[in-house]
């Protein structure tokens, strides 16, 4: 027999999932927009000094956080032989698990000194819902929530690939 309360629970779940997915997409878009702005600024600076531009690209990607699979995208920026990688995503299916620390999504930054080497993870972020219901990325330091991620903070990671 069909219980009317089951329909209410399903409707509430679907509404919450839709609201969270919208926040996740907004958070991911903020991250990609910030990286695009930073890369444009850096390329203008490099061009003014007659240096080659950053090589950038983005692709669909999956990565593991603890026992969960985050499904999303990976952004890469390369200058000469050094590479900076930014991964962002969240579980899409029940078998993917959940976002640790009650976050909406996770992101990681990796750095490689050589194009032949896998990027080593140097930073992790979690996307959280704010009191005003806007999403914001926060750094995770020693498995604890740290400072909010800003464009200037993201820009600092690019110094790793721009330095000698």
Q: What are the residue ranges of the model-derived segments?
A:
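Contiguous, amphipathic alpha-helical segments that mediate oligomerization or scaffolding
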Residues: 2-60
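Intrinsic disorder/low-complexity polar-acidic segments
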Residues: 65-164
């Amino acid at each position: 027999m069909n219980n009317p309360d089951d329909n209410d629970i399903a409707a509430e779940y679907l509404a919450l999932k839709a609201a969270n997915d919208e926040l996740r997409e907004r958070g991911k878009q903020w991250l990609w927009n910030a990286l695009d702005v930073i890369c444009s600024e850096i390329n203008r600076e490099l061009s003014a000094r007659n240096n080659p531009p950053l090589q950038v690209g983005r692709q669909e990607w999956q990565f593991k956080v603890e026992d969960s699979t985050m499904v999303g995208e990976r952004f890469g920026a390369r200058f000469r032989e050094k590479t900076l990688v930014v991964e962002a995503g969240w579980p899409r299916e029940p078998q993917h698990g959940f976002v640790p620390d009650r976050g909406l999504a996770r992101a990681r930054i990796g750095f490689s000194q050589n194009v032949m080497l896998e990027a080593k993870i140097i930073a992790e972020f979690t996307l959280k819902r704010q009191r005003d219901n806007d999403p914001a990325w926060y750094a995770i330091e020693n498995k604890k929530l740290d400072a909010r991620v800003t464009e200037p903070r993201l820009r600092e990671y690019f110094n790793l690939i721009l330095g000698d």
